[in-house]
From Swiss-Prot:
It comes from Stutzerimonas stutzeri (strain A1501). HAMAP family: TMP_synthase (MF_00097). Mg(2+) binds at D73, D91. 2-[(2R,5Z)-2-carboxy-4-methylthiazol-5(2H)-ylidene]ethyl phosphate binds at S137, H138, T139, G167. This is Thiamine-phosphate synthase. Binds 1 Mg(2+) ion per subunit.
Length: 213
């Protein structure tokens, strides 16, 4: 599968608080049924055994639905499962992760609102770069704001797929996609829902934005 086709569409990111009390697997499966093409497992706790169990179960769900699993900030877990990795600016060396995971692995990099960080990530072997926050974010409310001009500059200077993240909703996503963003990363606007059925409905709505002419 070409990288361009693997790295496009709704990028769902888990949240250990939103998806507590048994919601993780049913809500994630609902997002995948709704069309999410990538799933990032983001869990900052120290319970390695539980994270391995959950990541293994998520890998099975992603395989069943033809989606890509990305592990947040745990290169060893990503290597163990043979899946992708996402690194923040303080999560270790991207070049070292590339050496560990191999040439074919998907490795993404958080670049905040800074084009130089994205250019460095591209040199270090990133598969995609993530910019944000674009709007007020529940997950990282104090993060510096990114804007549409940054996206235009990044498209002109970096030959990698771009992820937009940070407070994105169904109302605000279209303007980002219109700027050429290949992936929209969503947490609360997807998973802060009362039921798995609602998650699936939201995922379908986000996914349809990428099919609009």
């Amino acid at each position: 599968m070409k990288e361009s086709s693997r790295l496009r569409g709704l990028y769902a990111i888990t949240d250990s608080k939103l998806l507590a009390d048994g919601r993780l697997l049913p809500y994630v499966e609902a997002a995948l049924k709704g069309g999410a093409r990538l799933l990032q497992y983001r869990d900052k706790t120290s319970d390695e055994a539980r994270r391995l169990r959950e990541a293994d179960a998520l890998q099975e769900l992603c395989a069943r639905h033809g989606a890509q699993l990305i592990i947040n900030d745990d290169a060893e877990l990503a290597a163990r499962l043979g899946v992708g990795l996402h690194l923040g600016q303080e999560d270790g060396s991207l070049a070292a992760a590339r050496a560990l995971l191999g040439r074919q692995a998907i490795i993404g990099a958080t670049c905040h609102a800074q084009l130089p960080l994205a250019e460095q990530a591209a040199r270090d072997g990133a598969s995609y770069v993530a910019f944000g926050r674009f709007f007020q974010s529940h997950t990282k409310p104090g993060a510096p704001a990114a804007n549409h001009e940054l996206l235009r500059e990044a498209r002109a200077r970096i030959g990698l797929p771009i992820v937009a993240i940070g407070g994105i909703t169904l109302d605000t996503a279209p303007s980002l996609i219109a700027e050429g963003v290949q992936m929209i990363a969503v947490i609360h606007a997807l998973f802060a829902a009362d039921s798995a059925a609602e998650v699936e409905r939201r995922a379908q709505a986000f996914s349809q934005l990428f099919n609009t002419p």
